[in-house]
Amino acid sequence: MDQVGRFVADAVLGIDTLWGGDVMCPSGTGRFIADSWFSDEPLPAAYTTPAAARVRETGGVGGKTVDREAIEAYLREVDIPAAMQGLCGEAEKIGGLRGQYLAGLRFCLQTMWELAMEILGKGKPVPYDRCVQASTGKLPEPSQPEAKRDRVAELLNRAGYSAAKSDGLLGAVDGWRRERVVPMASVKALGAAVIAYFDNLSAAHLLPVLPKELSRVPRANIDFLPIKDAWFSGSMNYLGRARNADGSPQYEASYEINASLQISFPEFQQLVSHEVVPGHVTTFAYLQDLYVRGVAGFEATVLTMNTRAATLFEGLANNAILIAHGVTEIEQLPDEDMQIGVLLALLQDDAKNQSSYLTWGEGKPQAEVAATLRRDFLVSEERADKLSGAWGRHPLLGRMYLPAYRCGTERVAQLRREFHAERVLPAIYGCFGLVDISTVDEVLRAAKA
């Protein structure tokens, strides 16, 4: 590992540990900020130092009860600010596209550090604007759900679920969902079928525009795992550490889905395209291959939530169902039930942004936020409660991650309308160098020049 790799490893895994994450845990129940570690490099001191295990065990600064003694011991052993400063210096020396990416990563990590210090009472409150700008490159703004909501009402009416009845549009949505609910007892079989469907579509509409070297990379080597009593609705865990006899990666991942989740089949289709193929699993597998072939740097192997790269990846994943079908607009999808499912999923991600905006930007109470999400964004009662509560009021996720979905989705959709697939898809999958929601423009502008 070179010097920049050491700084990236210590900074990312230092922040991850400080917030209670464990990148080596195969389950989303233990992971948090760092999404992957598949380089075959030794883990850094930020992970292996004796004090780190206790911080992870107690949940770090995000734990129900903050173990200050454990955190202080860890911070005496690991100098996270020095790693971030070193990363900043390396970014300046490297320059170009990679240098800009590393500088953006450092800005996000610095903001996460400041949020941790805020919780510990060692720093000033971090402005909400700074948090959102760090992870998305933009200032916070409210969601605009009206057009999607109107289109849902139109499609539901055509399907026989009229919003004109006494229980209104919410009642129509709930009725539509009830008649299409996925039986969780059969989720593995259904998941395999839907994965195969989108993998075949991706072979037809994505693979031809990517470098031929990626054709041998499995896009969806994943196990679907129902999990009980999880705090999340679903968690994609990219592992990438299994090797074939010749030492090549197997590009393996798992997807844990909450066994209590109620989801319609069209929404499940969108979920699979988002989390698996051609969404997150495909993206991570391609980046692993690019790293193995020396096209991408070490930073591509330790991907990180609450960053501008994560915003781009969420945007890619939310557009994945369109990418798979080779279209740019929801109304071009072949089935109106599928269109409803996509619109409802995107409204849920608009609701994530709105929860963040109302909670941290306007200081609204949870009950008011939950009611707004249910009424204006058509989310289920369970989703409204989670997005306004556990997620929305989380000191890190609520301020840095919830705005990422909407921002990334709208930007990727715009880029796909503006540029031909032969240019934009290789760019957002990292084939011209690892990019984020801000630096992807530089790659595409260079192509236009």
Residue ranges and their predicted role:
Residues 1-449:
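N-terminal maturation segment of proteins
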